[in-house]
Design a protein with these regions (language model features):
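Pepsin/retropepsin-fold aspartyl endopeptidases
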Residues: 21-411
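Bacterial Sec-dependent N-terminal signal peptides
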Residues: 1-24
Length: 411
């Protein structure tokens, strides 16, 4: 497979599109949220996807799966409304998605959701749009950061695939002692940001566990500000490995939208986030915003301390650093061309796919002998492959030329 997991890209774009995009006043809704227990600790078995945590919950007697998304201000549900949902009167509520489209938001309450032994009542979520078209049943929606601001502290144990949740202040203090950490501040009532120091400048970013598989992302807009200053420009240009035209695809509630832009790939030997040192990061500028994604949690577990407003990192190897070494992350990706789900390639110069003749804009028409005319068909094929196993691709260029290549799945 490609050097970048298709699901990683699609889910990342979805998370960005759903998180922090609503023009909604949620304060009154969140006041009504109640927990069934006090002074509790619970441990829940979860699924880990490229460092992201997918949590099983029970709703209306059925197990569903929600992505724990620190980049989403509030909960979100894909697809249409279901019988168990309690409608909220939100006639004046509008949404504005990442593609500049607007519409009326459909807000509902989850009357009762059970996460492990903890019951959560009256949890408000936003419903609908086209986001679910690109998820293909991988999970049903998001848990937003609003549950943390309601007083829950959690440990995302990505080493043992566990979620530990508690309302006890100081519960994780002993485990967190001496470990790298960073304070977060709430740019909005339920939207945390962290201060990140790069070799050529510093900025606030979202630490977004819903940016599945992503390391550190910059935007051309922010990079342009640093490029105006001579010393910073020299540092950026010295670290730039590639500058090339590429496609940037955003998936919002209204569907997907592709733009052509110039992307820089910048190698950063070190990045500082509080007392955490992130090493060997390869950063793309082809993004709508600056963020740090779930790739960090492929190498470390995470404690979110709601009382201290702090992220604590527990590197799996016992050190105080995280080595990303994510150059392959930017080599090749497959993104939806439009709402139909037809996939087109985004290829970095010098990559294996590039050397084999695949180019940005080529369409994926076949994988392992099966025609590909939608996202979910390809995902089903890919999930049958283990890392290192090869997939036989057939691409078609815009001029009709067919290209047959074999590339192994990398993760």
């Amino acid at each position: 497979m490609n050097k970048k997991n298709l699901i990683t890209i699609l889910l990342t774009l979805v998370a960005v599109a759903a998180g922090a995009q609503d023009k909604v006043s949620w304060k009154s809704f969140l006041k009504a949220v109640e927990f069934s227990q006090r002074d509790f600790v619970d441990t829940i078995k979860v699924k880990i996807e490229s460092g992201a945590v997918i949590v099983p919950v029970e709703i209306a007697g059925r197990e569903r799966h929600l992505l724990f998304d620190t980049g989403a201000e509030h909960g979100f549900w894909f697809g249409s409304q279901e019988e168990w949902m309690k409608p909220i009167n939100a006639d004046s509520t509008k949404w504005h998605d990442i593609n500049g489209k607007t519409g009326m938001a459909s807000l509902v309450l989850v009357p009762e959701m059970r996460m492990g032994r903890l019951g959560i009542s009256n949890y408000p979520i936003s419903v609908g749009g086209h986001l679910g078209d690109y998820i293909c049943g991988r999970f049903d929606g998001f848990i937003g950061f609003d549950l943390v601001t309601k007083g829950l502290s959690v440990k995302l144990d990505t080493k043992d695939s566990l979620l530990i949740v508690t309302d006890r202040k100081g519960f994780f203090d002993e485990e967190a002692k001496g470990r790298p950490s960073v304070k977060y501040w709430l740019a909005k009532p339920t939207y945390p940001m962290v201060y990140v120091e790069l070799p050529f400048g510093s900025t606030y970013m979202s630490f977004d566990t819903g940016a599945i598989g992503h390391g550190i992302d910059l935007s051309n807009e922010v990079l342009a500000q640093w490029l105006k200053k001579k010393k910073k420009r020299e540092t950026i240009e010295g670290a730039t490995l590639l500058s090339d035209t590429t496609l940037n695809v955003n998936i919002g509630r209204s569907g997907c939208n592709a733009d052509t832009l110039v992307e820089r790939i910048v190698h950063l030997p070190t990045v500082q986030m509080g007392s955490l040192t992130i090493k060997d990061a390869y950063v793309s500028s082809a993004n709508m915003s600056c963020r740090v994604g779930s790739a960090l949690l492929k190498h470390a577990s995470l404690i979110i301390d709601s009382a201290k407003k702090q992220y604590v990192f527990l590197p799996h190897d016992g050190t105080s650093d995280i080595i990303l070494n994510d150059k392959a992350h930017h080599s090749m990706s497959l993104v939806p061309k439009d709402i139909t789900g037809i996939l087109q390639a985004v290829i970095r110069k010098g990559s294996e796919a590039y050397e084999k003749g695949v180019r940005t804009g080529d369409y994926l028409i076949e994988a392992d002998g099966i025609p590909i005319d939608d996202v979910c068909t390809y995902i089903a094929i890919r999930q049958q492959k283990k890392p290192g196993e090869e997939i036989h691709f057939v691409f078609r260029s815009p001029d009709g030329t067919k290209k047959r290549v074999v590339i192994a799945r990398t993760e």
